[in-house]
Amino acid sequence: MEEFERRRHFETLAATPQALKAAIRGLSKKTLVFTPAPGKWSILEILCHMRDMERDAYLARYRRILAEDEPRLPDLNGEALAIERNYRNAKAAEVVREWLALRRENLQMLRKTGRAQWARAGVHETAGRLTMEDIIRRHAVGNDEAHLGQIEAIKRRFGILERLAAAPAALAAALKGVPDDVLRRRPEAGKWSMIENAAHARDLERVYQGRFSRMAFGERPAFWMLENDRMAEALKYASADPADVVKEFRRLREDTIALLRALPHETWKKTGLHPTKGELTVEQLAARLADHDEGHIGKIRILRG
């Protein structure tokens, strides 16, 4: 490894404390404990894992390699540690304080490591022979960059699901107490009324459920272009009952959220071909659905006045 590479990895390790504090600043307890997919860790559990790896993996390995000749380096079972150390009930602020202290200790040790010492090595029980250079690369890229990326992905997913969960109540509030004639009045020719916008949101939920399922269980499915005005006429949006629309939208949205929550982590990266937007991941399509909700509920609020 060239000197500039070691320096780059060291700089990554030195920058992570500020990056991590920024990533979790202001997060609610609900966000911290949200699990993005079955069997996947929450942000809180990732923080606990980072703390324990900082101490029991990286700090311990650096120390042993610098002090001993080719020491044996045990593997650590992260899943077992999460259960044994009760990550789910940890206090995030305490965990981060402990991690910061450990990171400072690691940085101090690495600053003092001489050029010849970077070639010293230990023998990992599953990965084989690892030099100090190998370990700092794993520390910076496989640990810091990977876990910061996971935290950002969880925040995005949580935000999307929260937006989706909020839509039924927002739609109900936008329609509540509106006189029937106002509810069904079109603002101008070719523009939908309040009830037509609401019924469209309800029926697009079924379309999106189908798209999510096809993406989850297929390979890059292509989606058809919708003819929204023809749907509105065929399904009689103009005469829909607002209470029924809200009730059905709420039921369908609960099913959509249950479907998305049940998807394995990697499935959120699977793609489909949108007729106008091109290739989209499940995550991107879910964000578009939240945008779609907010767009039509916004139109209803404008029409309500």
Region annotations inferred by a language model:
Residues 1-44, 55-305:
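Aromatic-glycine hotspot motif
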Residues 47:
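Short-chain dehydrogenase/reductase
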